[in-house]
């Protein structure tokens, strides 16, 4: 099928898209890479994609044909670039007939009367590799052209094996002699001489005497020719032309807009179209435009729902061969690369290398802005966008932008509800693979990330990173509103909701909203009255594990949190924090209605209900409502008669701990409430308030019978008995 004509601003339909675009893009990338790396010796093994025998069987005939075409074109690009790097200027300007530039080529053609490459299947011969490549593509050979030789390596699928990925040799059609590099295929000297030229210093084998001499010079430190502009030293005169050609004509096509140089005019054309915003390649279905046609290939298949590459194991289909290759490597049953340190199996060699860096902690890529190090260049590129503020990936649903594509992918699933990753143990689904991985560890108990300071282990690396900041004291996430700092980004996000008033977690039963998910979970249990956590000592049940842990400390008597000011101990850290505020006088929670401040957020919440009149806690026995759950609990004991708080001095029992605390002052003689005017002290706060009225002469309690006024209600009640002749005592 012919490639779609996109070079002149034409529209593209689904029927006009073919796999040739993918082939062209891959070949162009290889050619560009080879040119940039011209200084080093490049072999076909550096750019070839290798398949194992098992992976090859998963490909259907059309996928094998595509693979064959791409590899042949890569091979052609490799041969062309390598030869041009080693010939002089005039040869570079010749078209694709670079074989004719060498006398050795003419001698090589003497094998078959001027025909270098032989097509054994049909008998047709060609003088150039490009001619053979084109001919191979025009033949509808199907599976018959696939070599069945699967020894140590995989042969490129072609009726006449041209090269082998592992040892990488070319076959000269007439004599069948194998060579280690493409230019040497055309060397008559190589055809008549065995591979016996080796250099004893390093043991390398060469096909050409000049290559051997050049290698020997590199060992001896010879630098006979030196190129002045770049200072590159060369050991033989033939190579001296190479830097000249590379500096002068390696990238002859220069963009006038930005000055960037390109090897080929096609690359320059694509670059020029980017600057003025020209996008001649436009799609009929959605109007998506791109400066180059190859950019639309993958996108077109989205509209066409075309996924020609299908995995034979699980049936999953992909738009391109590269997607299938990655899938085959990441398939759970196909993880041939095992880590020698921990035994973990990876689906690809690249993944194994990345995993290996977690053991060595190797981070060779540094940010020039902040100096932070990363394991690979892609992570560094993503990080740099934090400094530049670039967010190229935008959500089509809500317009939110992201710095990385995976961030957008995860976000889109919040709109679609897609959760493609399912736990095989419990069936729970997740929108990200990392979420599933973390969840699976709850079943296995695996905690691979261990703190070197205290030995505590974690299921995810981010938790370890946050924990490590406890030891270092680092708090990099700071609130711009109040300056409060946090060890993790999630802590800052939750804190910001106290400023914005955002409450994203809403109860489906009553509509009440919360700013923390755990608060919503706690609230939901008030509807279900679920208390799944039971104390093994007294069988008391609780809504969550934290409440149970606090309760257990009543039985054990453990109070690990001690106040440095007064020595008082507490069972939980939050109680110590609240207690410290009694010494400092800090009251950070202020009522916006009346301005009254409180030491704890729970006290503020209860206070606000005095303004709103809200009483969400209702007694099922009598229907009485309360503003706080603790008041409801105390009230229920009036029905049950329960008095769990007993005085150790006199044995008196009370329904609430606060009542016991106040009663205890009778035995200790403690009087914490002191008058500032006269210094008189009281053990109850209401008694101090009554005393203060003697200074203000406030008399608000008036007798209805005689009009006499009193300072407090108890005095009025005592006076009322005079009018009723009541004598209760």
From Swiss-Prot:
Zinc finger (C2H2-type): 115-140, 253-275, 279-303, 309-331, 337-359, 365-387, 393-415, 421-443, 449-471, 477-499, 505-527, 533-555, 561-583, 589-611, 617-639, 645-667, 673-695, 701-723
GO annotation terms (biological process): regulation of transcription by RNA polymerase II
Keywords from the named record: DNA-binding, Metal-binding, Nucleus, Repeat, Transcription, Transcription regulation, Zinc, Zinc-finger
Keyword Phosphoprotein: no
Family from the record: Belongs to the krueppel C2H2-type zinc-finger protein family.
Stated role: May be involved in transcriptional regulation.
Protein name, as recorded: Zinc finger protein 778
Organism: Homo sapiens (Human)
Name of the encoding gene: ZNF778
